[in-house]
Amino acid sequence: MINGDINEFIEKLWSGEELIYVYNGKKYFSQGYIKEDKVYVFELQMWEPDVKTLWQISGKDNQESYEIFLEQPLFDGKTFWEIEKDTEWVDD
């Protein structure tokens, strides 16, 4: 993880905090939240070069959502763990 500690990033990811990170020239945003009907939602959006929701899961708890997210090939066909060393954690 560039510009950050991977353990801190993963802790924030697990807790659903809003995170912004860049991989391969693309800016990503992820967050988890509880809707009014008490359903937990975790989502991944791309902010640059295009704005779109890439992936979303709902109805699972944060732990299960987090584990499923980490297994998905969402980043140019790679999982988060495959891109982690080349990913920059940004705050903007």
Model-derived features: where do they sit?
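Negatively charged, low-complexity tracts enriched in Asp/Glu with abundant Ser/Thr
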Residues: 1-23
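Intrinsically disordered, low-complexity regions enriched in Ser/Pro/Gly/Gln/His and often acidic
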Residues: 21, 40, 48, 73-74, ...
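Short, isolated positions in well-ordered beta-strands
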Residues: 28-29
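Short, surface-exposed, low-complexity cationic segments
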Residues: 33-56
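Acidic, low-complexity intrinsically disordered segments
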Residues: 54-92
